[in-house]
Amino acid sequence: MAKPPLGLYYSTPAQGTCDRRTMAATDATGHSGEHKAKPPSSMTQIPSSSKSIEQDALSVVLVTAGYDHTIRFWEAWSGLCSQTIQYSDSQVNRLAISPNKRIVAVAGNGTVRLYECSPAAAMMSHSDTPSRGASVSPISSFDGHYGNVTSIAWHCDGKWLVSGGEDGTIKIWDTRTSRPQRVYDHKSPVNDVVIHPNQGELASCDQSGSVKIWDLGENKCSHELIPEEDVPMRSVSIASDGSCLVAANNKGRVYVWKMRSGVAEADQHEHTELEPVTKFQAHDTYITRCALSPDARYLATCSADTTVKLWSTSQYRFALNKVLQGHQRWVWDVSFSADSAYLVSASSDHVARLWELSSGKTMRQYNGHHRAAVCVALNDTSLEP
């Protein structure tokens, strides 16, 4: 689609509508999505005095990866590495844990691979998991990107997976057949893609500085936003209630839009409306990731300046709440606990850290990577049968 004129978070109005129905696909993980998430987080239920490490491993899936060609599973509360998997193909760029906590998707160069988050494997003795890692075969592979796969996200029932890459495409994969159902051309290398909570839209950003909304019902780009021409947009996040969209760029700036559902008069179909509400300078240099907390009360930003910053979203003011300091090099990724009380960060200093957000203190360090740790995924959501 044609680029809109330069302007502050310019929005191309939606053309057409979306019925908000998710795409038809089969769950390749062998599960029909019968597990439903419910609060609170398991993280706050694991004080060492009341829960064992084994229970920790079963209730919390914490994974890190990076440039040492390993994927590491951690016992979140003890800080011990429970399993290491070799990923010899390339560095690992992104991780995403399936909603049922059984599978981790791993994005590398040209490929997304799926590995089991096996409780049995997670409870192997540490003598059986050397630092170089075990050679474990993936249960599935998604091939088709050219160059690095920079982002991945799961459909809420695991029926499909979305990926974005340096080749300028977004691909939606059937998780059973490992084949792409949809391919969208972003016209520029994709840095991030997320799924709207309604499961009917995607938000993505790219190296040219654009943020796009993709309407899956209409099978097209419905909005294009260009906050700053030719300033790479690094990361996007959507609030869990679908109320706002946040994007962060290479100049350390954050842009925020309100998201509303509307109905087009022409065909009476539902569509998303975007309203710019604020922008602010979060860091003095590159922002590598932005993430809204599950309760939508906080925004976390991490940066090349070695910090993680926590911002209050109250009334869209985005006041600085805390600066989390302790990493020695770039911080590349962050992931919140389900109750928004904790956050895990991954850094070029080879270390991942668990932060208690009420105090701003590091509760655990996860040591074991031999090169930069650039991605982290945490899923401690309680599942009901």
Region locations from a protein language model:
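Residue-level detector of Asp-centered blade-edge/turn motifs that repeat once per structural unit
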Residues: 56-58, 99-100, 156-157, 197-198, ...
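Per-blade loop-tip surfaces of WD-repeat and WD-like beta-propellers in eukaryotic adaptors/scaffolds
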Residues: 73-83, 114-139, 146, 172-190, ...
